[in-house]
Each structure stands twice: as structure tokens, then as C-alpha cells.
Amino acid sequence: MALRIEDKKAIVAEVAEQMSSALSAAVADYRGLTVNEMTSLRKQARESGVYLRVVRNNLARLAIKGTEFECLADALKGPLVLALSKDAPGAAAKLFKNFQKDHNAFEVKNLAMSGELFGPEKLDDFAKLPTREEALATLLNVMQAPVTKFVRTLNEIPSQAVRVFAAVGDSK
């Protein structure tokens, strides 16, 4: 059934709005998946905070025009599902990677981030990207390590002095 022009405009506006706040995007070929498998993918996407939509390629091209995901325009060929990571840059890639393990028919086509287009070989790299909280925790640990070592060194001076005095006292 053909979509009316108003419906097409609404879809383009919705996808464009989602893309404006997305951190990364992934597209995959979903041919060969059953309805239950697609429903499962949608459920997993909702749980992981990923916007997932099957959208016509022409409408997707209109939606990505003027966004950082414009690099995807030439890669939109065939029936594709579009996933946008909202909270963590690797969320969509992680979702697709985990789903692809159990479903051979599901094939990741491209990934995009910060205006750059990446092939499916980068899926593992994207999936390993830390969440914001994980990145901040790692940064905090890196910043805290020298201070912790310095405090331990300062604490060791009186401890060594006490041990020396105890050894001298034991020897007399």
C-alpha cells in the first residue's frame, strides 16, 4: 500500500528528529527474518535505548540530508533497518552484533559516526565502544592513579620510620 504524502513527510520528520540527537547509526539488511525475529530485535532495541526503524531508502535519504549521517546516503540500497544510538555510541552496533550471532540472515551493511562511513568490518570496534559512564569511570581511574601512588608514598615514610625504630628496639 502506497503512503500518502503527509505520511511520508511525517516519517521524514520523525527520522530527521531522531538523527539530530543520535551519536551513531547502523544499517542492516533484514531480508530472511521472520516477523517474530524482527519483533524480538525491536524489543531488544527498546531495552537498550536504540531507535530502530524500517524506512524506505528515499525517505531515509531525505531525513539524513543536513545531518552528520549524510555519508550514509549512498549506502542505502535494498531493504534496510536503521538503528540510531541515542545514549551510547556503540549501542546500535552492540545490538546488531548480538542479534547477528543468532540470525544468519541478518547482515550489517554500514555504520556511521561523526560524519564518517564505516563498513561492516568495524562492527566489533563499534560494539566495544564504552558508554559515557564507563568512559568517565576509566578517565577518573587514570586521573586518580598518580594521586593515589603519591599518597601511598607519603604514607610509607612514617611506616618505614616506625619499622626502623621497632627493629632498633628489638635489637637492644
From Swiss-Prot:
Q: Which processes are annotated in GO (biological process)?
A: translation
Q: Which GO terms describe its molecular function?
A: large ribosomal subunit rRNA binding
Q: Which UniProt keywords apply?
A: Ribonucleoprotein, Ribosomal protein, RNA-binding, rRNA-binding
**Gene3D superfamilies, per this entry?**
3.30.70.1730, 6.10.250.290
Q: Where is the signal peptide?
A: none
Q: Does the keyword Ribonucleoprotein apply?
A: yes
Q: Which GO terms describe its cellular component?
A: ribonucleoprotein complex; ribosome
The family database entries (InterPro entries) matched by this protein are listed as: Ribosomal_uL10, Ribosomal_uL10-like_sf, Ribosomal_uL10_bac, Ribosomal_uL10_bac_type
- Give the quaternary structure: Part of the ribosomal stalk of the 50S ribosomal subunit. The N-terminus interacts with L11 and the large rRNA to form the base of the stalk. The C-terminus forms an elongated spine to which L12 dimers bind in a sequential fashion forming a multimeric L10(L12)X complex.
Record family assignment = Belongs to the universal ribosomal protein uL10 family.
Q: Which NCBIfam families match?
A: PRK00099.1-1
Role, per record: Forms part of the ribosomal stalk, playing a central role in the interaction of the ribosome with GTP-bound translation factors.
The identity of this protein, by name, is Large ribosomal subunit protein uL10
